[in-house]
Amino acid sequence: MADTFLLEVATPESLLVRDQVSEAQIPARNGYVGILPGHAALLAELGEGKLSYTAEGRRRSLTVQGGWLEVSNDQVRVLANGAE
């Protein structure tokens, strides 16, 4: 099993994040989803809140507002309606 997975965060305007990360906490409609390498496939409605992740040992975050979350084959795609 890999130690990292690919995280992509995009809005209709731009690609905000494309990085190999070791973990992520993502706001879904009904609460936060914790993602680690090897996570099972998942499709979920994105909530509003702070998306945080660890890349190269550094904790980073941004705020997302609605959209979709997809987890598949050690790739996580967040398609957000808005983010900052």
Give the positions of each predicted feature:
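Compact, glycine-rich, soluble single-domain proteins
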Residues: 4-84
